[in-house]
Design a protein with these regions (language model features):
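Proline-centered turn/helix-capping motifs that create local helix->coil transitions or kinks
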Residues: 106-116
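A short, structured beta-strand-centered segment in the mid-to-C-terminal lobe
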Residues: 81-95
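Short alpha-helical DNA-recognition segment
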Residues: 17
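Short, contiguous alpha-helical
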Residues: 2, 9, 20-74, 100-103, ...
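Phosphate/pyrophosphate-binding loop motifs in nucleotide- or prenyl diphosphate-using proteins
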Residues: 75, 79-80
Length: 176
């Protein structure tokens, strides 16, 4: 997870608010969407897995000033086209806070905890159509499934979007 988070740190340290808020054309989400969406979803996923309160709250919204105070999972592309990050430095602080918490949790997790079922079968409609439902075993989505799908795989997917979108603003990718 730390290596994947490192890609996000590399990306954010080589961009500014102009880059992340750029809209290439209608239907193409700004980098701001992918950055905030993924970070906020990792924050929310942590809550679903551990029961701990998310980092994101009204205070963080006042600091970061995203234009759409929502991760956007259940919104349309048209709605999320409006996503912008108002204070990019504060966003980077929020991201670091979320990622540090996840990494600290993973560093101390009891391996037996990885088998605990987070969402049992049968899955609700919102879950049944997800990648994690495909990965889940007969009992449902375990902590390991959730961390792999909701955090790691999801993070890499959005990093791919970010690397492509960086080319739209004259920046390159970070890996080969």
């Amino acid at each position: 997870m730390a290596t994947m988070h490192g890609l996000y740190y590399q990306a954010t340290s080589t961009m500014d608010a102009t880059h992340v808020n750029h809209v290439e054309r209608p239907g193409t989400l700004p980098i701001a969407f992918s950055l905030f969406h993924y970070t906020n979803m990792e924050d929310a996923s942590f809550m679903l897995i551990t029961g701990e309160t998310p980092v994101w709250n009204d205070g963080w919204q006042q600091r970061v000033q995203v234009s759409v105070n929502d991760h956007g999972k259940h919104r349309t592309v048209e709605e999320m086209m409006a996503q912008r990050i108002g204070d990019y430095d504060e966003f980077c602080t929020y991201q670091r806070t979320v990622f540090d918490r996840t990494e600290a949790w993973l560093a101390q997790i009891d391996p037996e905890e990885l088998e605990r079922v987070v969402i049992p079968r049968p899955f609700p409609d919102q879950v049944a159509s997800t990648y994690s439902a495909r990965v889940a075993g007969p009992g449902g989505i375990t902590v390991l499934d959730a961390a792999e799908c909701w955090m790691y795989q999801h993070g890499l997917r959005h990093m791919g979007e970010i690397e492509l979108a960086r080319s739209f603003v004259g920046l390159g990718g970070m890996t080969s």
